[in-house]
Amino acid sequence: AGRKVRVFKHGPDYLDPMVLEVASGQPVYQLHPWMTGEDECRWRLMEAAQDADLILVEGSMGLFDGDPSSADLAKLMGIPALPVIDARGMAQTFGAVALGLSKFDSALPVYQVIANRIGSPRHGAMLRESLPEGISLLGAIPRNEAMSLPNRHLGQIFYLITQTFSYHPNLQYL
């Protein structure tokens, strides 16, 4: 509690930054090397770092999808990736997916992951146990159909998502 968080969004998205701005209480800018240029991306991050305790950049699509991808931006800016992995219906495969993401591009560090849509505390423990050495589980978000994100009406479930997130991933370890 009490941390000043600055949030950015990768990609040409206009709805997500508005939602993220409400959540963070700070302006949210897009970081996209092709749209805004590398210098603009660096300047925005450096400016935010002057007074922020934590900077989060929400990616777009899959980590390695798009041109430039979220991974490309992270490498360009020297930011480690924190993948959120849909864990529904997985146990040991969760560890394989995390390992694959960490090894796919050796220039992109992946130290932690977040499990999304877990079924129970035991499921979360199984996911944690499946992770290879060097990758830890930062948090596990329970499955809750009320928090699913349909393409429309995203703002209607924002409160529920923020309440649930506040009880699960432990941001003090970031």
For each predicted feature, which ranges?
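ATP-dependent carboxylate-amine ligase catalytic core
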Residues: 1-77, 85-108, 121-125
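Short glycine-rich or small-residue beta-strand-to-loop segments that form or flank ligand, phosphate
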Residues: 82-85, 114
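Internal gly/pro-rich beta-alpha loop/helix module
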Residues: 91-174
